[in-house]
Amino acid sequence: MEKLKLTIAVTGLNNTDNPGPGIPVIRGILESKEIKARIIGLAYENLEPGIYMPGMINKTYMIPYPSSGTEAYMERIIQIHEKDPIDLIIPNLDAELYTFMKSQSKLQELGIHTFLPTFEQFEERHKANLDKFGEKYGIKVPHSKAIVSGSDIKKLENEFEYPVLVKGKFYDAYVAYNSDQVTNHYNKISAKWGLPVIIQEFIKGTEVNVVALGDGFGNTIAAVPMRKQFITDKGKAWSGITLSDKEMLRITTDLISKTKWRGGMELEMIKTNSGDYFMIEINPRIPAWVYLAVGAGQNIPEALVKLAMGIAVPPYTTYKVGKMFIRYSWDLLGDIQEFEQLSIFGEIEK
């Protein structure tokens, strides 16, 4: 059977100790037996390691940050598309998703496919809305509160017991054991990610995660649970192992069925010593550890590409339990000419 030829643009090429999902997504796509992909990298910084990794990306273009505004952002995407036609874009960072969701119809007119959550799905799972989300869908969640001012911190003792988690609206989470630490983390997070900052009840237990893919009609196409075995100081998994956990899969399939989730997602949960599961976060895109799912037998990036292109995908029903991943540091060597070309012209071909 002839492979489906596609030009696929991917973001999230940072592959350091705070990795983006871009390279794992690309690896999954390149391993597909049914898709022959030409990969375009969309980079925000000219030192994102994924740009220079051999065998991953055919051509990289620099793009502005989403904070530059939807119009400027999409103008650059269209400019790239006119020069180098794109069949599909896979945005992999939370901060980009709103811009791409808002521009879906425009992209579709240009022949650029996406496979993203709806606005309602994206908004209701926000950390600030987690209490309502849990109540609506029958999921246990820790108590959360969004704060927008330093004066709100003094009132927290009326609602929370220390320690608490202090979270950014997109990224970052810190444990605080008193109000001074909350203030510290609040200032750091709000300066980086803006407001609100979310205060969340601290649940004792083991953190477990699920990477999943919904087809938009309530069907779970893929779901693989794992436990982080080593976590960096940024809270990212440095190693992990797939689990046999029917309850995690039940929670996932039930949630996708009720929400009719469209696209990739990551569910972050805490399993308590008594066996209860608390949903602490729902990330509306594929996580950076997705290649573990590929290795376990569920090629989620490949399935997402097919769904985006209107190809029916039967649900995965099995995966390998006990499959592990370990991240490592590796020095890539390159020439200054590559860096200069990217800096001056905003593009580079490998």
Model-derived segments and their meaning:
Residues 121-204, 216-218, 246-249:
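Active-site nucleotide/adenylate-binding loops and adjacent lid/helix of ATP-dependent enzymes
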Residues 302-350:
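Peripheral (often C-terminal) accessory segments that flank ATP-dependent C-N-forming ligase machineries
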